[in-house]
Design a protein with these regions (language model features):
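Core segments of small alpha/beta cavity-forming domains
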Residues: 80-156
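Exposed beta-sheet edge and beta->alpha loop/turn motif
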Residues: 17-23, 51-67, 170-239
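N-terminal secretory signal peptides
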Residues: 1-27, 35-44
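Juxtamembrane and targeting peptides
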Residues: 23, 36, 41, 47-104
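Secreted/luminal cysteine- and crosslink-motif detector
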Residues: 30-31, 48, 160
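A short, amphipathic edge element
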Residues: 150-170
Length: 239
């Protein structure tokens, strides 16, 4: 029926929209959004120290703000029940993203969240491919956040990271930043020509997590664990 809410049922994968929302919910387990350490990396110890990096703000806590976009495609048209979003602005790397500074980490994470947002709203992997992350990680992120929306779409959606601490901490070569990840899903979902409303109490997905980054080859790299996707599906669905 036109107003039927999407049912999140892990046992049913025949409906592209159900599959898409299931995946979007499941991946809020901390690995996909935050990159829990690279495969084989040494686990973080209990002893950490403040980041030994240059910074100009001192306190970066709160929702990461990101405003670096390419809007050359034309006037943006949000998704409707009749068509998916058109001319969606593409996130581009800020000028300081590769700087070995706290601001550089901040920009790298903001770019990552914006790339996930773009994937959800378009079903494309274009921007995820630009994220500073190992190829296996980028492929996994797209499988969860973009691919399900190649045949279905939702109302305008957004992924953000909310930093809990003023600054990241450092252990060996890894910088860690605790955060809350939040995905806000649009008011409706469309698949196979059918539009269905999503109730307001099922449109926000949040999870507490940690972000791990290392500075390699003159850029910040967001770490990923190649095994997290199988465990991520055990998360609680909230959409």
């Amino acid at each position: 029926m036109m107003n039927e809410e999407p049912t999140i049922d892990r046992k049913r994968n025949d409906d592209p929209m159900t599959s898409a929302l299931t995946r979007a919910s499941a991946v809020t387990r901390r690995a996909v959004l935050t990159g829990i350490a690279a495969t084989g990396a040494t686990a973080l110890g209990a002893c950490t120290s403040s980041a030994q990096l240059t910074d100009i703000r001192g306190d970066y806590s709160g929702e990461i703000k990101f405003d670096s976009y390419d809007t050359s495609a034309g006037t943006y048209e949000p998704a409707t029940r009749k068509h998916r979003a058109k001319n969606t602005p593409k996130p581009v790397k800020p000028a300081n993203i590769d700087n070995k500074t706290v601001a550089g980490i901040y920009s790298a994470l903001g770019h990552y969240a914006a790339a996930i947002t773009y994937a959800i709203n378009t079903g494309e992997d274009t921007c995820i491919q630009q994220v500073n992350m190992e190829e296996a990680g980028k492929k996994g992120v797209y499988e969860y956040f973009g691919k399900p929306f190649t045949k279905a779409w939702v109302g305008e959606s957004k992924c953000v990271f909310i930093l809990k601490d003023p600054l990241p901490t450092k252990k060996d070569d890894t910088y860690t930043w605790p955060c809350t990840t939040k995905i806000t899903i649009g008011e409706f979902a469309v698949s196979d020509g059918r539009a269905r409303d999503i109730s307001s109490d099922k449109r926000e997905i949040t999870d507490d997590a940690e972000m791990h980054l290392t500075y390699k080859d003159n850029k910040w790299v967001i770490s990923t664990d190649a095994l997290f996707f199988s465990s991520a599906t055990s998360g609680t669905n909230k959409v």
